[in-house]
Structure formats: structure tokens, C-alpha cells
Amino acid sequence: MLKKPIIIGVTGGSGGGKTSVSRAILNSFPNARIAMIQHDSYYKDQSHISFEERVKTNYDHPLAFDTDFMIQQLKELLAGRPVDIPIYDYKEHTRSNRTFRQEPQDVIIVEGILVLEDERLRELMDIKLFVDTDDDIRIIRRIQRDMVERGRSLESIIEQYTSVVKPMYHQFIEPSKRYADIVIPEGVSNVVAIDLINTKIASILGEL
């Protein structure tokens, strides 16, 4: 195991391909100690309020996340200690009672729409990536994902996108692009960018 694990931040708009890019990196190093942690896992617990109120929460605002807890757990992993990561229930709009045990790794991919927005998170990262995808593609992907995986109606997805997701993208997510070391147009289909990133990671891991 490396003396200091590598932390890679991957961000971009909802439906922009962050997870696909993260998994492409993950799958490129099958023999390495590497894991992905999603900022979504750290949405705040909302079990104390009604379901109707949870639905109204702005999930694209920094205040929706317990980023303090995420930072605390990342520091534990950096120190070589395992953590129990929360598991978020998208259909109930709150944390579940379950957690996932994450052991320390050599490479930790931190993925989420706002992971470059918080300076404290950025300071923990060795490589910062922004996945830059066209707005039309992102909304189509979001509709497909939320209807199939999260059981949501088309009407609710479009309403949330126009009233919350799009404004928050321009207020918080897009401005964080200036902090990225690498901007990846077209996401995982940008093979050249993915190869360059993997080469950098491999050089750090000593696999070249």
C-alpha cells in the first residue's frame, strides 16, 4: 500500500457521465487497491421530516450534503483506517439504516456533482477532473436513470430539472470547473483523456 493514498475527484453535471468515467478508471486497474466513494452517499439524513418535505429538498445545493462527515471519513481512510459509509435511499429521500464498510485503498475516486465546490475536499485531492457534457445529453440521461432506477415520474424529473437542477448547475457546479486539472469533453467516450488520466495514475502507482 502507498504511504499516502491518491484521491481523485470526479465532478460534472447530473447525468454528465461522472460515474461512467469513474468506473472506466476503476476498471483499468483490476489488480490495484482502488475504490469509488460517491458524494451522494453523504446526503443528509432526513428521517425526521415527512416524505412530502423530503421531496421538496434541493438536492443539488451544497447544504443538502453532510460534507463534513465525508471529509472526516476520507481522512480516516488516508490514515489507514476503515470507515462505514452511509447508504442513501433515493426512493425514500433519506439515509437507509445500512452502511457499507470501506477499507483503506491506494486510490480513492471521489465522485459527485459538488466535490470540487468545497475547498476542503479539493485540498484532499491529488487529481481533479471535470466531465463536461452537453445540457441536452445530461437531461436525457437523467430522465432515463431516474425513471428506471429511482422510480420517479417524467413530470417530477422535468419539474426538478427546470426549477432546481439547471439553476444549481450554473450557480455551483459549472463554476467549479476552474478548479479541475483536466476537463473531459464527452465523458467516457473521450478515450484520449481517459488514457492520459490512467497513464498518470499508473505512473504514481509504479505500474509503468
Curated annotation (Swiss-Prot):
Residues reported to bind ATP: 12-19
Location(s), subcellular: Cytoplasm
Keywords: ATP-binding, Cytoplasm, Kinase, Nucleotide-binding, Transferase
Positions of disulphide bridges: none
Entry EC no(s): 2.7.1.48
Reaction catalysis annotation: uridine + ATP = UMP + ADP + H(+); cytidine + ATP = CMP + ADP + H(+)
CDD domains: UMPK
Domain of life (superkingdom): Bacteria
One Pfam family per UniProt: PRK
GO biological process terms on file: CTP salvage; UMP salvage
Annotated GO MF terms: ATP binding; cytidine kinase activity; uridine kinase activity
Family annotation (InterPro entries): P-loop_NTPase, PRK/URK, Uridine_kinase, Uridine_kinase-like
GO CC annotations, alphabetized: cytoplasm
Metabolic or biological pathway: Pyrimidine metabolism; CTP biosynthesis via salvage pathway; CTP from cytidine: step 1/3; Pyrimidine metabolism; UMP biosynthesis via salvage pathway; UMP from uridine: step 1/1
NCBIfam families in alphabetical order: PRK05480.1 (NF004018), udk (TIGR00235)
Cited HAMAP family: Uridine_kinase
Family: Belongs to the uridine kinase family.
Protein name: Uridine kinase
Organism for this UniProt entry: Streptococcus equi subsp. zooepidemicus (strain MGCS10565)
Gene: udk
